[in-house]
Amino acid sequence: MEQTYQYAWIIPFVPLLVPMLIGAGLLIFPTVTKNLRRMWSFQSVLLLSIVMAFSIYLSIQQINRGSIYQYVWSWIINNDFSLEFGYLIDPLTSIMSILVTTVGILVLIYSDNYMAHDQGYLRFFTYMSFFCAAMLGLVTSSNFIQIYIFWELVGLCSYLLIGFWFTRPGAANACQKAFVTNRVGDFGLLLGILGFYWITGSFEFRELFQILNNLISSKEVNLLFVTLCAALLFVGAIAKSAQFPLHVWLPDAMEGPTPISALIHAATLVAAGIFLVARLLPLFLVIPYIMYFISLIGIITVLLGATLALAQQDIKRGLAYSTMSQLGYMMVALGMGSYRSALFHLITHAYSKALLFLAAGSVIHSMETIIGYSPEKSQNMVIMGGLTKHVPITKGAFLLGTLSLCGIPPLACFWSKDEILNDSWLYSPIFALIAWGTVGLTAFYMFRIYLMTFEGHLNVGFKNYSGKKNNPADSMSLWGKKGSKPINKNFRFFTIDEKGENQTKISYTSDPFESENTMLFPQILLCFVTFVIGFLGIPKELGFNLDILTQWLHPAIYLLHHTNSTDLAEFLKHTVISGGIAYCGIFIAFLLYKPTYSSFKSFLLINSLHQKSLKRVIRDKIVFVIYDWAYNRAYIDTFYKNFFVCQVRRFSQIIRSFDLRIIDQIFNCFAFLSFIASEGIKYLGYARIPFYLFFYFFFVSIFIFLFYKN
């Protein structure tokens, strides 16, 4: 057994072979490497599959034996300081390794076809393999030094992948925004690491936890300073996992290719913050108030992400805000001490969200056959609709992922989310009300996305659409057009003439079509995983002997509430309540977004009935306020732009003016005086060498005389 663990250090290095081989091939055999570029997708999948098989084997060993293995190699610089490098294999490591590899393999298979015609095909697979390697290095790290190194590499890869199409201004701005926002969190993480090293004198996790626990127990450390350092560590997780208030980069990150979005949202970048908090949970548990702070940030993010997703027209941005909200649930669970619930939801959400993003990519791929390559149009749900008959497999996959995310039994997210919801009542009734209420919001906005995309008729021809996109901080109307009023109140109905026909249609010669098998296979496999993965964590109290997750996590459980058993009656009661809330959200989404014109030939009667009702007017005002809030991203981006970006620019202008008018002028004066002096000496000596020598020896003699005189 120990021999197996000794080879675990290769986990992050195996995927790293792909970028190294591609780089060497482009240097030595550039033409052959480019001509055989499709071969590299197979290499990427093969190497990541090796890591997946090894990770699964380690996980089976841990489930059977419940062992934790750590290897540390010390590099002694002097007697007082040494750097330690190594790797840690525990349940958290094995869970994250399996998530990264399984989702990564499916995304790579999908990407082979999705990126087939892109000129940056080789660059894409280089970045993706490096991304997986960096994430695997992060999850196997045994100390803060390695965590920070791989943390920065993950951030670098996200910058490269979000800005993959860097010639597009939107993508270039998005990757910069993500990079700068994460720098705030990374700086906090660095300060927190240095603070805890100053307190404990160690970077290694297990040793640091033990020392800090002893110091706090004996009251030999300032609790205020320890709490501050812990909060700084958590700031790093806030930025990476797009939690409030450092969430602003996440929707703009959708400028990258869709497979990247699937990997980022399922198992890598945003999961890194959850992983960090889970890894440091023994540290946070012994520090007063920090756990409440974690749960508070999480519950704010749960509600904020759900409300901002209510009015998105870009299908990928709607899913991005969904990710933000679901990550908030995981943070709430970690803040409550429900370690198992948080990791369970991390697992189920990863596969469900990967399925949704890959299905969304398939939809975008099919829309490009009609409107050409235009992300502003191909991702806009307003011009979609009626895709069920064109992409039936993709539609089924998206529907299954939607039902899972809504918490509909027996799909994956139902089991994990209900566990978090049940624990929330024991922690805080206020938090519980928000968490349970957001279940309805989640069901509403997810079925809104589904209905706008797949139901009704294809809306490419309607004239009320403009694909023009705004800057992230600008408001955007329902139809994607900039304006003072971002909401069209009668958003369910398009402009029609007296006969009930569309006023303006754009003719198109082709229909959307289903994606190829290499894009459908990962979706079908994820459908199966989404259906069965939740059964791994069914509590034993329900009469099913399937709770593999608890046995898997047994060596590293830090739970607060799972000492209480849950009987079948209580479980069914909570299931009925959460399911009822979810179905209410689905029902409201159907009322608002189910195309009424599918059953009626003319819109005139329907429009008149809706417009003459007083309740309709009041409802429209409420809808307008909600949509205005959502479209303007709760005005948080605007606030940052006005109070941070603009102020920094003004300050930089002041510094620039000071530099030009004061600093530069001072040095220019010295330069001018030197020029005058040199010109004077030149004319004084008539530009002859004997005169220069005379003045030289004259002044040297004076200097020597004064020196010896003193």
Curated annotation (Swiss-Prot):
This enzyme's EC code(s): 7.1.1.-
Gene from which the chain derives: ndhF
Name of the protein in its database record: NAD(P)H-quinone oxidoreductase subunit 5, chloroplastic
GO biological process: ATP synthesis coupled electron transport; electron transport coupled proton transport
Keyword terms: Chloroplast, Membrane, NAD, NADP, Plastid, Plastoquinone, Quinone, Thylakoid, Translocase, Transmembrane, Transmembrane helix, Transport
NCBIfam families cross-referenced by the UniProt entry: NDH_I_L, PRK06590.1
Compartmental location: Plastid, Chloroplast thylakoid membrane
PANTHER family: NADH-UBIQUINONE OXIDOREDUCTASE CHAIN 5
Oligomeric form and interacting partners: NDH is composed of at least 16 different subunits, 5 of which are encoded in the nucleus.
Ranges annotated as spanning the membrane: 9-29, 40-60, 89-109, 125-145, 147-167, 185-205, 221-241, 258-278, 280-300, 327-347, 354-374, 396-416, 425-445, 519-539, 571-591, 657-676, 689-709
Chief place where the protein resides: plastid
InterPro entries documented for this protein: NADH_UbQ_OxRdtase_chlpt_su5_C, NADHpl_OxRdtase_5_subgr, ND/Mrp_TM, NU5C-like, Proton_antipo_N
Lineage: Eukaryota, Viridiplantae, Streptophyta, Embryophyta, Tracheophyta
Membrane topology of the entry: Multi-pass membrane protein
